[in-house]
């Protein structure tokens, strides 16, 4: 405690530990109508996957019903979901992108 004039100044140190942000998986879900080439394009454009990575994820989506495009903090994941869903609708595809807690 320090005294400045007639005022006592109390200095308290509070140590806080920053917690890492909650992470979310961005998932593409399979449907019977969206062309495989369009899914690959989405993976390359929105998730920066190379052709081989995009093809592998697309095949996982096709065979297992869904595939993980990436894991991001909530704000980024939410933005990517919105962008992908808007892009799919603009191109008349029912492709669905969603979030899952990692």
UniProtKB/Swiss-Prot annotation:
Disulfide bonds: none annotated. One of its GO terms (biological process) is protein catabolic process. Pfam families: ClpS. It comes from the Bacteria. Signal peptide: none annotated. Gene3D superfamilies: 3.30.1390.10. InterPro entries: ClpS, ClpS_core, Ribosomal_bL12_C/ClpS-like. SUPFAM superfamilies: ClpS-like (SSF54736). Involved in the modulation of the specificity of the ClpAP-mediated ATP-dependent protein degradation. Binds to the N-terminal domain of the chaperone ClpA. Belongs to the ClpS family. PANTHER family: ATP-DEPENDENT CLP PROTEASE ADAPTER PROTEIN CLPS (PTHR33473:SF19), ATP-DEPENDENT CLP PROTEASE ADAPTER PROTEIN CLPS1, CHLOROPLASTIC (PTHR33473). This is ATP-dependent Clp protease adapter protein ClpS.
């Amino acid at each position: 405690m320090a005294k400045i004039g007639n005022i006592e100044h109390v200095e308290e140190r509070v140590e806080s530990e920053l917690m890492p942000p909650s992470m979310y998986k961005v998932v593409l879900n399979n449907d019977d109508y969206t062309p495989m080439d369009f899914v690959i394009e989405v993976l390359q454009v929105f998730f920066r996957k190379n052709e081989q990575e995009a093809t592998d994820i697309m095949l996982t989506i096709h065979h297992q019903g869904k595939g993980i495009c990436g894991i991001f903090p909530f704000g980024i994941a939410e933005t990517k979901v919105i962008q992908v869903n808007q892009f799919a609708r603009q191109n008349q595809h029912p492709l669905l992108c969603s979030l899952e807690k990692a």
